[in-house]
Amino acid sequence: MSDILSRHRQLCELLIEYGHQYYVLDNPTVPDAEYDRLMRELIVLEAEHPELKTPASPSVRVGGQPLTAFKQVRHEIPMLSLDNVFSGEELQAFEQRMRDRLKREVSFTFCCEPKLDGLAVSLLYVAGQLVQAATRGDGTTGEEITENVRTIKAIPLSLRGEGWPARLEVRGEVFMPKAGFEAMNAKALAAGEKVFVNPRNAAAGSLRQLDSRITASRPLAFYAYGVGVGGEQLGGSHFGRLNQLKEWGLPLSPEVKLKEGAAGCQAFHDDILARRGELPYEIDGVVYKVDAIPLQEELGFVARAPRWATAHKFPAQEEMTELENVEFQVGRTGAVTPVAKLKPVFVGGVTVSNATLHNADEIERLGVMIGDTVIVRRAGDVIPQIVAVVEAQRPADARAILFPTECPVCGSAVERLEGEAVTRCSGGLFCEAQRKEAIKHFAARRAMDVDGLGDKIVEQLVDKGLVKTPADLFSLNAIQLAGLERMGQKSALNLVAAIDAARSTTLPRFLFALGIREVGEATALNLANHFLTLDALRAASVEQLLEVADVGDIVAKHVYYFLRQPHNIEVLEALLAAGIHWPAIEKKEASEQPFAGKTFVLTGTLTTLSRNDAKAALQALGAKVAGSVSAKTDVLVAGEAAGSKLVKAQELGITVWSEEELQQALQG
C-alpha cells in the first residue's frame, strides 16, 4: 500500500505543477499527451482506491490558480473540463455509460465540433452589451480580461438582432490561427525577440497581457462553443443554441455538425483527423456533446466534467523523448543542417527517430544538449522538430552540441556570414552533396546553355561517377554518353557537340553558371561590366566588390570567399583549361548605358521578342530588371494580358510602356 500512496502523491504533485505551468504561467514544460497519461493513471488509481481521492486532487480540479495580476472573477456556473476518449472502443463505452445512467435505451444525437487548442473564456453580455470577459482559471474562479477581449475583432461588443436574454454568458475559445502565428513568430525572429512554441501558448500569452495594446497587436480569433448564464432561455438543443449565438453575431466553427450515435461521432472524428493539417487553426481532437438539453440536465456532472460530453483526442502532435545524438547533413545548396537523432517515439501518428534542429541559432535558443529530454512536435506532413527542452530532467553527463568547422561531406571549410542564420559548405563546385544541383545549374539554358543536357542525364552522369564537377563535362565522349539510359549513338554525338559549343560563352553567363550564392543574372552582368575580366574579379577585395552596382555586403562576401575556396579554384582552373572562353568586354561609356540606375519590370506576353531577350537588351543598356513592382520601379513594360503588376504600377503612378515603346527605346 505504501507504494500506491507514494505513486498517488507523486502523480498529484506532478499534475499540480504541470497544471500550474499550463494554466497560470502559459509555459508548459511537458506535452499535453504526457499530462493526459498522468491524469488517466491518477483517475484509474483513485477508482481502485477511492479513499485516496480528496477535494484537492487534480482529478477533481480543472486548472491552476488565477494570476494575482488580474482581478478575480467567480463563475456563476462553473466552467468545467472534459473527460477524454482515445479510441472507438472508449467512445462506445462513453455512450453506453450514459444509457446505463439513464436506465433506458436512448438514441443519442451529438453536436460535434473541433477541439480548438486555445484558451477558454467566458463573455458576459448585459442588455446586449459586452460587460465582462474572464478566463476559465480553475473552473470556479478566473481572471478578468475584459479590456483585452475588447481588442479581438471577432468578438462583438454589442449583440446583433433581438431576443437575447437580459444576461447572457457566451463561452468559447480564443485561439491564434496558424497563419497569424507563423507571421508573428517570423516578425519576432527578425527582431531578435523570443518566439512562441505553439499557437496555444501564443493565444494564452497574448490574452493575459496587462497592457491591452499588446493584445490588440496579436492575431487572435474566437469561436463560441456554449452558453452559461441565460442558456435556459435559448431552447432545448445545443446545436440550436449555437446557431442562435451565430445570429446574434458570435462566430462559430464552420465544422460544427450534428451526428447520430457513436458511429456518427467516429465518422466525424475520422473526417476531421484526415483534414487536420488543412484547417487554418490548431486542434488536438474533437468534442461530442449530447444535443438534447433535457438529456444533458438528466445526465448531470461529475466533479470536474459533464457526463454528457467528452473529448476524442487525436494522436499527440507533441511527445517527450531523449536526444541521443546530433548529426549534420549537407543539402543541395550547401546548407549544413543539424539533425537530432532521437530515441524512437510515436507522435503525430508515426514513429519518429529524427527531427530537424534547423541551425545554430535554434540550438542556442532552445538551449538543447545531447542527452536532454526534449519535446518533439510533428504536425501533419511537417518535418518533426524539437520545440522545447525539459531542463528539469537534464542528466549530469549532457553534452553541448558543437557545430562542425568543416563540411562533413567534402571537408571544405564551412562559413556563416554575418546576418545569416544558415551555416554553409564553401565547396560549391566540389562538394558531393551539392554536385548534381551545381552541374544542373551550370548547364542550364540561362547559364552555359548546354542543349540536351537535362536533369535526368545529369543525375545518371553523377550516379555513374562520370562527372564530379562541371569541368568533367568537357571530357565526356560519345561512347560514355551512349551507355546512359535512353541515350542512343546519335543523341550522344549531339550532346558531345552541344557541350563543345558551350565552350564559347560570355563572361556574365560564365559567372552566373558558377552558382555563386546570391549571384543571379543581373549581378553577374554587373560584375562582368565592372571588372571586365575574370582575373580582375578574382583579385578584387570585398571593398572593391562593394563598388559594383547592386552588390551589398553579403553578396560581396559570397563572391570573395567563393573565388578563394581551394576546391572551387581547382574547378575554375579546370574549366579554363577545358577551353571555355568569351569575347573581351569593352568598357562602356555612360552614353552607352542610358538606363543605368533605372529599374524595369516586364509583365504580360511580348510578341516581337522573348522575355529573356528583352531582359538582356535592357541590362545591356544599364537597366536593372526586377521580378515584381514596388515603389522603386521606374518603368513597367506591359505586354498582352498584363495582370496584377499593371494594376499595381498604375496605383503607384509608375511609368508604363507598351511593347512598341520598349522597341523604340531599345533602338535608340
Swiss-Prot record:
It holds the Pfam family Nlig-Ia. One of its GO terms (molecular function) is DNA binding. Keywords: DNA damage, DNA repair, DNA replication, Ligase, Magnesium, Manganese, Metal-binding, NAD, Zinc. Residues 590-668 form the BRCT domain. Transmembrane segments: none annotated. It catalyses: NAD(+) + (deoxyribonucleotide)n-3'-hydroxyl + 5'-phospho-(deoxyribonucleotide)m = (deoxyribonucleotide)n+m + AMP + beta-nicotinamide D-nucleotide. It is an enzyme of class 6 (ligase). Its cofactor is Mg(2+); Mn(2+). The active site is at residue 115. GO terms for biological process: DNA repair; DNA replication. Its EC number is 6.5.1.2. InterPro entries: BRCT_dom, BRCT_dom_sf, DisA/LigA_HHH, DNA_ligase, DNA_ligase_AS, DNA_ligase_CS, DNAligase_adenylation, DNAligase_N. NAD(+) binds at residues 32-36, 81-82, 113, 136, 173, 289, 313. Belongs to the NAD-dependent DNA ligase family. LigA subfamily. DNA ligase that catalyzes the formation of phosphodiester linkages between 5'-phosphoryl and 3'-hydroxyl groups in double-stranded DNA using NAD as a coenzyme and as the energy source for the reaction. It is essential for DNA replication and repair of damaged DNA. This is DNA ligase. It comes from Aeromonas hydrophila subsp. hydrophila (strain ATCC 7966 / DSM 30187 / BCRC 13018 / CCUG 14551 / JCM 1027 / KCTC 2358 / NCIMB 9240 / NCTC 8049). The gene is ligA.
